Amino acid sequence: MGDIRKVVFEENKLEKKLCRLVGQAIGDFGMIEDGDKVMVCVSGGKDSYAMLDILMKLRERAPIDFEIVAVNLDQKQPNFPAETLPNYLRSLGIPFHIEEQDTYSIVKRVIPEGKTTCGLCSRLRRGILYRVADELGATKIALGHHRDDILETLMLNMFYAGKLKGMPPKLRSDDGKHIVIRPLAYVPEKLLERYAIDMNFPIIPCDLCGSQPNLQRQVMKEMLRDWEKKHPGRVENLFRSMHHIVPSHLMDGEAFDFKNLEISTELSGIAARSSGDRAIDEADLDELACGTMIQGTYNPSL
């Protein structure tokens, strides 16, 4: 009995942590508002299953009212288990919609054999999901990208595209008609892997299309996992850095007006240097009396 209680305790602990992280992301970025109808995109993978499950749990205790409708896009891939998701969603007792669109044939016709089809497939899928959201009257579209997806995208853009660009937790579509949210933005993938096992989700393999894996993304994934093992805290700090941007210390002239930067006589002391390179003189000492200086950084929390 002791072992069983321990297992149940650990499962509840994981569920609470996921609820906390998802709830925090929703609150931080204003993802869901009172009266929203959230279209939860469910692919049959561990991430979207967990997202749906956690959103359902949060809806029960949230101080606001919002609807959930689960949507799956059946892209007519060979050997796709067409009844798996309908049966599962039906068992949950929630509204759901299965959209059948043969994008598989389109992608196979356009992309050469042996090449990854993920890019074109995702763009086709996005257009269909936007249309379905309109038809269902959904005000938000929830996707199951997690923290690791966001970091991998950041690194991919830096290494292969020369851009400091990630994957936003909330965005407006190019046509301005849809709001896409990523409630799992704060959730590490390893927690979702554990949760999928605990919940025994009916996972549908993601390689049914026969596409080659995105090797560049796989390299980023392995690199981040290697960092996590060898340098604890590095990945978390990398993710944290996305929350603390200092445009004046980068090189994007559109994000910061370097050309018109001039000496200012209106700012003084620590306030004048809040964006980065801080110097200390005698006049600053009173302001620092209650704080701690470490390597030139004023950290009042220490």
Swiss-Prot record:
Cofactor: Mg(2+); [4Fe-4S] cluster
SUPFAM superfamilies: Adenine nucleotide alpha hydrolases-like
Compartment(s) where it occurs, according to its Swiss-Prot or TrEMBL record: Cytoplasm
Reaction(s) this enzyme catalyzes, per UniProt: cytidine(32) in tRNA + S-sulfanyl-L-cysteinyl-[cysteine desulfurase] + AH2 + ATP = 2-thiocytidine(32) in tRNA + L-cysteinyl-[cysteine desulfurase] + A + AMP + diphosphate + H(+)
Cofactor-binding details, from the entry: Binds 1 [4Fe-4S] cluster per subunit. The cluster is chelated by three Cys residues, the fourth Fe has a free coordination site that may bind a sulfur atom transferred from the persulfide of IscS.
The organism's place on the tree of life at top rank: Bacteria
Residues involved in [4Fe-4S] cluster binding: 118, 121, 209
Broad enzyme group: transferase
Transmembrane annotation, as ranges: none
GO molecular function, one term: ATP binding
CDD domains recorded: TtcA-like (cd24138)
InterPro entries noted in UniProt: Rossmann-like_a/b/a_fold, TilS/TtcA_N, tRNA_Cyd_32_2_STrfase, tRNA_thiolation_TtcA_Ctu1
Main location: cytoplasm
GO BP term, example: tRNA thio-modification
GO cellular component: cytoplasm
Other facts noted in the record for this chain: The thiolation reaction likely consists of two steps: a first activation step by ATP to form an adenylated intermediate of the target base of tRNA, and a second nucleophilic substitution step of the sulfur (S) atom supplied by the hydrosulfide attached to the Fe-S cluster.
SUBUNIT field: Homodimer.
Protein name: tRNA-cytidine(32) 2-sulfurtransferase
Organism of derivation: Polynucleobacter asymbioticus (strain DSM 18221 / CIP 109841 / QLW-P1DMWA-1)
